[in-house]
Amino acid sequence: EDHVKKVKIVRKLEKKHNRFICILGDLQGPKFRVGKFTNVKEQLKKNQEFTFDQNKKDGDSKRVYLPHKEIFKSISVGQRLLVNDGKVRLKVKSKSPTSIKCLVTDGGEISNNKGLNIPDTKLDLKIITPKDKKDLQLAIKLDVDWIALSFIQTTKDLLTAKKLIPSKFKVMVKVEKPSAMDEIESITENCDGIMVARGDLGVETNPEDVPIHQRTMVAACRKFGRPCIVATQMLESMIDSPTPTRAEASDVATAVFQGVDAVMLSAESAAGNYPKEAVEMMDKIIKRVESDSKYLANIQNYNLDHTKTSTEAIATAALEVASIASCNCIATFSQ
């Protein structure tokens, strides 16, 4: 009911302000969580052993139930398991069909139903879960514009999921798994848009790798003419502050200079104390970058390593003419 109400509000505002607003239906995808603990939470210490198993009994400081058989099947010795957004890190020492014995490499708190990430493992799982199918039907009923797919690992995952989505809906791939980067060009070519989902991607990769992955995804989107969204922690401090940090302003500006099509707010507008100010600040940064003389030159100078079609050639020429003549808009024929 909440989603239905919000969609109606957006469509009403579209008419009021005469602006087209895209609505994206975000499918959660496969989400892994640990079981429960007798004492609700436990403190794991570095270098201790800890086991994930198929025993449904409440956990303690030495073990916990993991209700995902596909992990036991796919994970290998030496691979990592990350709990609580990567705050607790473990490495697999040994495994059996019903048990994964680990060494804690970074200790911390683990508690009931905390999320689990497996960055080094390609899992054999259903990308569209039963919950996703139910949510997809609601998205179709609400006539959203885009469907976002979470935790896509391979092109095969994408193509399998697309079979369940009516062709009238655009498909956005949220790149959250490092394994997706191995096939990023193929994934980009076979979807309608890419979201650089830096939250889960940042948990499963090293912090220094995330900016490189972002540039790679933006380049792939430019190569295949796909929209690209950069998301997560863009103005994170504005959840509690009316102004961003200088680093956050620079982060947003860098994404715009790279040529992305959209920058996205998450908790800043969904749960923050300054949602209006966060949107206004994001808008100011975008407009400031786009008014910079080097911005257009930067965009035009990107190397597109594919053969330009006649349509692309005409569009490129139209862009240059519009820039030189300071045109407010470009009119095109749809057929």
What does each of the following model-derived ranges do?
Residues 1-335:
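Non-catalytic helical/linker scaffolds that mediate oligomerization, partner binding
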